[in-house]
């Protein structure tokens, strides 16, 4: 059975009150149009960003192919001055390059010290902060990070989930975003937080037969659009044009639920991590049994988890 292809709903002129009281509790992706983002959507041209962003050194992903794979790491990390990154990312062919003349670039901005500081565009790029308004769709104390993203045209980012809620602000350019529900995790062939299925448009169903069952939610983002991505929703992003985006991440759960060492917003909540460690110990204990018994008691455990932990709410 082929999975459903569903459009992500779009709404225009949503107020803070509408979002927080009626839309946010639904925990579903949503494209918001007509949000006041400040002058960034018209000001952030290649020339302007190069001039204002200056020579600040940034760490980037460089890939010889458009389809980036975090599992096999088919890219390298390099450092460039910000102005050079912007100019190179806007090009199709490069006179100067690291890997090949048609290599792709991807910036995911970091904190000053990524081991202890979260990304915040207002701190790392202070001359740009006056150009952009963050939608006030969460309480200030819930704020986690704001991440600057710059992508070459055609670049595809692997399917993954984040543990924070986020707003993806498409400042310039155009992106296609495909999302999958957390309820469809069993069809996505996960390795950690990421899916092994790279080619989501033409997947190898002999290798990944269950992928066809995953429901696919899709939207196109243009300059000024804002996509709400709830925590745990998987997303795959293609930059159809050179573009600049900003992600704003915030905490859906109380702060004490999150790993305090997490500066990226992608470590599972501490209770989930503890449960996974307990499960690993249980599996080692099960391994002491012969296969026939191990299989039987593993199935009983799965049924017990489904009964006690799966949500009874239908989507």
From Swiss-Prot:
Cofactor note text: Binds 1 Fe(2+) ion per subunit.
> Is Iron tagged as a keyword?
yes
Residues that bind Fe cation, according to the entry?
160, 162, 235
Example GO biological process: wybutosine biosynthetic process
EC number(s) from the headed UniProt entry: 1.14.11.42
Catalytic reaction list: 7-[(3S)-3-amino-3-carboxypropyl]wyosine(37) in tRNA(Phe) + 2-oxoglutarate + O2 = 7-(2-hydroxy-3-amino-3-carboxypropyl)wyosine(37) in tRNA(Phe) + succinate + CO2
Q: Cofactor(s) for this protein?
A: Fe(2+)
Which positions are annotated as binding 2-oxoglutarate? Answer: 106, 166, 175
List the Gene Ontology MF annotations in alphabetical order.
iron ion binding; protein homodimerization activity; tRNA binding; tRNA(Phe) (7-(3-amino-3-carboxypropyl)wyosine37-C2)-hydroxylase activity
Gene Ontology cellular-component annotations: cytoplasm
Q: What InterPro entries does UniProt report for this protein, alphabetically?
A: Cupin_8, JmjC_dom
Which PROSITE patterns does its entry note? JMJC
Pathway assigned to this chain's UniProt record: tRNA modification; wybutosine-tRNA(Phe) biosynthesis
The segment(s) forming the JmjC domain are 102-267
The source's domain of life comes to Eukaryota
> Which controlled-vocabulary keywords does the entry list?
Dioxygenase, Iron, Metal-binding, Oxidoreductase, tRNA processing
Xref: Pfam families: Cupin_8
Complex and partners? Homodimer.
UniProt xrefs under PANTHER family: HYPOXIA-INDUCIBLE FACTOR 1 ALPHA INHIBITOR-RELATED, TRNA WYBUTOSINE-SYNTHESIZING PROTEIN 5
According to its UniProt record, which protein family does this protein belong to? Belongs to the TYW5 family.
Q: Its function?
A: tRNA hydroxylase that acts as a component of the wybutosine biosynthesis pathway. Wybutosine is a hyper modified guanosine with a tricyclic base found at the 3'-position adjacent to the anticodon of eukaryotic phenylalanine tRNA. Catalyzes the hydroxylation of 7-(a-amino-a-carboxypropyl)wyosine (yW-72) into undermodified hydroxywybutosine (OHyW*). OHyW* being further transformed into hydroxywybutosine (OHyW) by LCMT2/TYW4. OHyW is a derivative of wybutosine found in higher eukaryotes.
This chain belongs to the protein called tRNA wybutosine-synthesizing protein 5
This chain's source organism reads Homo sapiens (Human)
């Amino acid at each position: 059975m082929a999975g459903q292809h569903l459009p992500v709903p779009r709404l225009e002129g949503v107020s803070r009150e509408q979002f927080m009281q009626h839309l946010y509790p639904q925990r579903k992706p949503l494209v918001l149009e007509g949000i006041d983002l400040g002058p960034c959507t018209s000001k952030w041209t290649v020339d302007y960003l190069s001039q204002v962003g200056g020579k600040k050194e940034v760490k980037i992903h460089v890939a010889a192919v458009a389809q980036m794979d975090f599992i096999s790491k088919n890219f390298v990390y390099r450092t460039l001055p910000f102005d050079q990154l912007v100019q190179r990312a806007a090009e199709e062919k490069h006179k100067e390059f690291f890997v090949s003349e048609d290599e792709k670039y991807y910036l995911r901005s970091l904190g000053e010290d990524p081991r202890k500081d979260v990304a915040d565009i207002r701190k790392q790029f202070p001359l740009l902060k006056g150009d952009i308004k963050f939608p006030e769709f969460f309480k200030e104390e819930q704020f986690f990070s704001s991440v600057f993203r710059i992508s070459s045209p055609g670049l595809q980012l692997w399917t993954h989930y984040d543990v924070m809620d986020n707003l993806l602000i498409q400042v310039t350019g155009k992106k296609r975003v495909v999302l999958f529900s957390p309820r469809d995790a069993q069809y996505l062939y996960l390795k950690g937080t990421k899916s092994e299925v790279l080619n989501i448009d033409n997947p190898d169903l002999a290798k990944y037969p269950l992928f066809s069952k995953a429901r696919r939610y899709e939207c196109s983002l243009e300059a000024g659009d804002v996509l709400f991505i709830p925590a745990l929703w998987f997303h795959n992003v293609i930059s159809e044009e050179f573009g600049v985006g900003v992600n704003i991440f915030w905490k859906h759960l109380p702060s004490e639920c999150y790993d305090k060492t997490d500066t990226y917003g992608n470590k599972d909540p501490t209770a989930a991590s503890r449960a996974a460690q307990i499960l690993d110990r249980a599996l080692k204990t099960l391994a002491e049994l012969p296969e026939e018994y191990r299989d039987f008691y593993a199935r009983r455990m799965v049924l017990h988890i489904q009964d006690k932990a799966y949500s009874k709410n239908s989507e």
